[in-house]
Amino acid sequence: MHESLKKKWYVLQAFSGFESRVAQSIKEHVKLNKMNDFFGEVMVPSEEVIEIRGGQRRKSEYKFFPGYVLIHMIMTDSTWHLIRNVPRVLGFIGGKSDKPSPISDKEVDIIINRLRQIGDKPRPKTLFEPGEMIRVNDGPFADFNGVVEEVDYEKSRLKVSVSIFGRATPVELDFRQVEKN
């Protein structure tokens, strides 16, 4: 296959917050224009995180590259114009505006490996480290300060050393029961 007819990875800049919508629009434009052979995967590298708002657990999406979409495609004049005419696409990153350059296979491998490592299990948005100061905001130890001793991300629990009457007391708490100082 001729080098210019090989699919390569390109980075698109899109309106921030609209990355997923842009990726979906690209797929629809490709299908409508019957250009499936020129396009491969369109992705917005992200992971699901759990954050706690108002005492409630919520899943949200954390984008690795906010405002950017990765696209595997063969770059021709017609594919370039198709992408440039998708709403909320600001342009390609790298190279010249009319002749974008692809990102290296090494960079793509790093991104894809990172996505594989994450898997499907959402991680907590707030990460705790042993030795870190926290404040208990719920339960019998509410309003006490403590030091993180151990972190169990599988069960979303912490072992915290809370100072009660001048003595350090080990307590096991849920992520939802604490906040960072």
Swiss-Prot record:
Pfam families in UniProt: KOW, NusG
InterPro entries membership: KOW, NGN, NGN-like_dom, NGN_dom_sf, NusG-like, Rib_uL2_dom2, Transcrpt_antiterm_NusG, Transcrpt_antiterm_NusG_bac_CS
GO cellular component assignments: cytosol
Keyword annotations from UniProtKB, A to Z: Transcription, Transcription antitermination, Transcription regulation, Transcription termination
PROSITE patterns referenced in this protein's UniProt entry, alphabetically: NUSG
Matching CDD domains: KOW_NusG (cd06091), NGN_Bact_1 (cd09891)
Subunit comment: Monomer. Interacts with the transcription termination factor Rho and with RNA polymerase.
Family recorded in the similarity comment: Belongs to the NusG family.
Protein name as annotated: Transcription termination/antitermination protein NusG
Natural source organism: Buchnera aphidicola subsp. Schizaphis graminum (strain Sg)
Chain's gene name: nusG
